[in-house]
Amino acid sequence: MKNISLNIDKVAGFVSKETIAAYEPQVKACMETLENGTGKGNDFLGWLHLPSSITAEHLADLKATAQVLRDNCEVVVVAGIGGSYLGARAVIEALSNSFQWLKAKQDGPVIVFAGHNISEDYLFELTAYLKDKKFGVINISKSGTTTETALAFRLLKKQCEDQLGKEMAKKVIVAVTDAKKGAARVTADKEGYQTFIIPDNVGGRFSVLTPVGLLPIAVAGFDIEKLVEGARTMETICGPATPFAENPAAVYAATRNELYKDGKKIEILVNFNPKLHYMNEWWKQLYGESEGKDGKGIYPSAVDFSTDLHSMGQWIQEGERTIFETVISIENPEHTLQVPSDSENLDGLNFLAGKRVDEVNKMAELGTQLAHVDGGVPNMRLIVPELNEYYLGEIIYFFEKACGISGYLLGVNPFNQPGVEAYKKNMFALLNKPGYEEESKAIQARL
């Protein structure tokens, strides 16, 4: 079976392969730091060998709970924010029919998301949609006090109990939370919810392969064994025994750091398949939270091509030359569709008649890459044989491992996120949360 692969040929005109190869000692040292747990954030390295440590029994437990939700729910709401929902959503959206919502007959419960914003309109419309429906909730929160998720869960818990009764609600509400402490744990134990544990040594943005991601993905009807198998394969490929030049995570980390040193401060993750939109969003958090600190870090941006070629294409082609692109390139689509012939040919597209739509998309991808390289934008390609659970597992672990290496190359702690607390403190002060009286006075004086 083929694996995903990284092609950096279109970086050669900007950074030589010899320069990238010279990173080998530094990358090796970073990988040893990860393996030995001697670097910054070493208490959050549970993701490193997670794929190979996941047992068949654990997956069976997750699938059994997922089946309960599938059997009893028309809709399942995944409540979480950031790493507590983006990974699951990335996989689910990548594997789902683009028009799943519109299908008259569903293959399982509709999966919707909450707790990732504080929009009154969104939550009102969600609760209205859930009215009179049999719905369940997967509440994903280590603490149970993250404002966005806790607020959404408070609304959903009440509605679920009101519509289904407390006994059925107990059956269809599942908590993914801390093993022992926190408001979500206390509530789950009190109400008798089924629970799964978020490991203490796995941070949110690295948690896709824990119950945080695996349970919602299983509820959506996708094969979590294959997902883990793909990640397990990439754990080996990206491991310390693989030579530098054959290790895609090592080469990716080295290349992006050299480009950063060369003044390329923005990385744009590109896809040519709209199903990968939320994979882009997951990647943005993974790298943004991991590297954006101490006044350093590549800014992670993302685009959906060819759509965004008609909005961001001009800037990428001719704007400030501080960018590079990484393209997720899918070799084989799931479906086959040919361009028909038209007798009038008013649109002038008969030269495409008989060709697959994917061939047109592939030429758009190739043409874009060449144009951007000519315009001064280095390009890397992550080549993926097809979109399925196995290869998504490979993609997830590849990006996670490269992120750990890249953060250490940059000289930061890739496993903390102190900056995200600043807005919370201000918000709590403005809301007059108990314990924030002094902060409230100080912030009111600034308004």
From Swiss-Prot:
Tell me which domain of life the UniProt entry assigns to the organism this sequence originates from: Bacteria
Give any Pfam family that matches. PGI
Print the organism lineage: Bacteria, Pseudomonadati, Bacteroidota, Bacteroidia, Bacteroidales
Protein name as catalogued:
Glucose-6-phosphate isomerase
The family note in this entry says:
Belongs to the GPI family.
Q: Which organism was this protein described from?
A: Phocaeicola vulgatus (strain ATCC 8482 / DSM 1447 / JCM 5826 / CCUG 4940 / NBRC 14291 / NCTC 11154)
The record's keywords, sorted A to Z, are: Cytoplasm, Gluconeogenesis, Glycolysis, Isomerase
Record's GO cellular component terms = cytosol
The entry's active site is 289, 310, 424
Cell location:
Cytoplasm
Q: In terms of one coarse class, where is the protein primarily found?
A: cytoplasm
* Biochemical pathway: Carbohydrate biosynthesis; gluconeogenesis; Carbohydrate degradation; glycolysis; D-glyceraldehyde 3-phosphate and glycerone phosphate from D-glucose: step 2/4
- EC numbers listed for it are 5.3.1.9
Q: Span of the secretion signal?
A: none
NCBIfam families, per database record: PRK14097.1 (NF010697)
InterPro entries per the UniProt record, alphabetical: G6P_Isomerase (IPR001672), Phosphoglucose_isomerase_CS (IPR018189), SIS_dom_sf (IPR046348), SIS_PGI_1 (IPR035476), SIS_PGI_2 (IPR035482)
Named from the GO MF annotations, one term is: glucose-6-phosphate isomerase activity
Q: Name one GO biological process term.
A: glucose 6-phosphate metabolic process
